[in-house]
């Protein structure tokens, strides 16, 4: 591996226009006052870093639920999935992963399966680390059905700084575990609703790596009727 590969990561195409804008502002600031220009360069480098999209090595063993986001587990609780997905109104274990502005913000599919529903709902822009952000904030919800009929939901939630949720998938698509399904710009949160009876293998405060960290194990039981 080259040394540059350690420090320079691929950038997601969604970030190109933002890096271009930051770069143009940096050039303009150099004309005004050189120290301001260097601040602009720093901001441009940060923007590039924010939109980095490194490759991830996703565990391939059957029955694993993989973290959909980089960040820290902020909440683990029982909650009903978003009504707009049309899932059962039974409370499920919800694991929330909070992403700050320094985390990679490309989101990855936790399990292989077929997209059954994608639903966007406008809302507020509260601090994404708050419990009520799941209900009140702008969100994009995705339901994936696995081969055994069980379903899992991923919910992208906007936050104080994040004001744009981007989804790459639509209903009927087949996804592989670890496949990119979206991103959220500039700080946010992703909730995962586990199938009935499945318990998380992570705890609050644990650091997660999207597409790599095992969040839960489905096990042999609990198959859909």
Swiss-Prot record:
Swiss-Prot/TrEMBL site (Cleavage (non-hydrolytic)) positions: 187-188
Principal EC category: lyase
EC number: 4.1.1.65
Keyword Cell division included in the entry's annotation: no
Cofactor: pyruvate
Keywords: Cell membrane, Decarboxylase, Lipid biosynthesis, Lipid metabolism, Lyase, Membrane, Phospholipid biosynthesis, Phospholipid metabolism, Pyruvate, Zymogen
Pathway given in the UniProt record: Phospholipid metabolism; phosphatidylethanolamine biosynthesis; phosphatidylethanolamine from CDP-diacylglycerol: step 2/2
Cofactor info, note text: Binds 1 pyruvoyl group covalently per subunit.
Gene Ontology BP annotations: phosphatidylethanolamine biosynthetic process
Location of this chain's protein in the cell: Cell membrane
Record has Cell membrane as a keyword: yes
Subunit comment: Heterodimer of a large membrane-associated beta subunit and a small pyruvoyl-containing alpha subunit.
The protein's name in its UniProt record: Phosphatidylserine decarboxylase proenzyme
